[in-house]
Amino acid sequence: MDNNLTLAVKELAYRLGADLVGIANIERFENAPIKMSPKGILPTAKSVVVCAVHHPDAAIELDGEIHPQELGPYRIQYIMNDKLDVLSFKIGRMLDDLGYQAVPIASSNIWRYRGYKDMDAVFAPDMSHIYAGVCAGLGELGWNGLCITPEYGAR
């Protein structure tokens, strides 16, 4: 992605409420399992835009064993996923309007759009947002299997 386009994408993402934004070159996904690769969705992909929204610390720290029908403090996750979905859609539309192919990916989706090569399963994640965050330079893969960022740590 050229520098002007990178700046425009990041500017839009931050304006829409992203806390972190990174852009990964598709080569960073070269050895990723096909179920976690952007090439499984858009074989001609060259870059992957990754946005993150910070979870309020208290919503994570105060959540715990509660009644199974109570959502508790972590229910903020629904709002955050919606925010990430809007970010994905609007960035995808911007890229589409500029003549690029873009496939906005839902923040918590488990359905594929189509099979890919020898993988015909449709009940699988579109790709790993965790790996995408690492590939885009937002953080490192932690022992907990999550993308650990310098700004927000392992909380």
Q: Which residues make up each language-model segment?
A:
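Catalytic cores of enzyme domains
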Residues: 32, 73-155
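Non-catalytic, usually N-terminal nucleic-acid engagement modules in DNA/RNA processing proteins
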Residues: 1-89
